[in-house]
């Protein structure tokens, strides 16, 4: 039984996390479809976050029902942190991410989302958080090389599309089926502004990397992760609502009808706030802080499968190549983070040297980071 339990503890989290990435890509395709069909990204962001915040508020208390709340939460310093987390992790990130998606495709979302550890590494260097950094260590070399590979993948993603992997075939039952799907779902449109979409998505990734730095210290002071998520989700929703009211003054754009847009808002709100967050927090506690981020490159696989199985004239060789290169750099950075320094290397370190920001990964980072919100 012990061996069987161990196998299940390995297999089940793997399958569940892979399915989480599949659901995320599926919702991203549906969001692209809704935005292409005329739905305002600002309206979509407000409604999905409002629903998610309403669900998270009671759920966060239920999630931590057996834990004692030793640290006062509603203090002035914590409220400032909550505001900044909402501003960077919800307001800036989601507005730029969904605008970027409206100009590009889900595969670009995957490629740019994989830039997060590279941006985090550069921000840590700029802010002086890499105390005692040994440039000769294999960890540092791996992170530097991984960062360069990530940026190379992003560059390829922007400048090279290449031919379609699955062009329109001659008339056949299969082609007729795919043509029918294209009337209901959108993966890519020729009118998309690829460069602008990529730039917006890169800015969104930079925003979430800044958010990462803020949240690291926050969850050390306030370890009840779901309450922190609930609070900054509400703060970000209010910020988005104020901004969207100016960006989308047409009241008719805010009207909800009983159609696919409404179903998508409900599905995205529930999945993003409760299902995915709970699964990621649970898996990170079971398997460690590096387990959940390792599944980010699975988004490339699912986007490629969906893009080639259900769409024609939608997925380019160049976009898959760029995403694959970015994924390689991402995995190299992750590999470097779990490596221990060679004890034979003499690197000057402070006695009170702390773990660098990428190593202090917490369930909050795993619960709501990168492009999982898209």
Curated annotation (Swiss-Prot):
Residues 26-155 form the EamA domain. Keywords: Membrane, Transmembrane, Transmembrane helix. It is found in: Membrane. Its main location: membrane. InterPro entries: EamA_dom, WAT1-related. It is a multi-pass membrane protein. The chain crosses the membrane at residues 11-31, 42-62, 82-102, 107-127, 145-165, 194-214, 228-248, 255-275, 292-312, 315-335. GO terms for cellular component: membrane. Coiled coil: none annotated. One of its GO terms (molecular function) is transmembrane transporter activity. It holds the Pfam family EamA. Belongs to the drug/metabolite transporter (DMT) superfamily. Plant drug/metabolite exporter (P-DME) (TC 2.A.7.4) family. This is WAT1-related protein At1g60050.
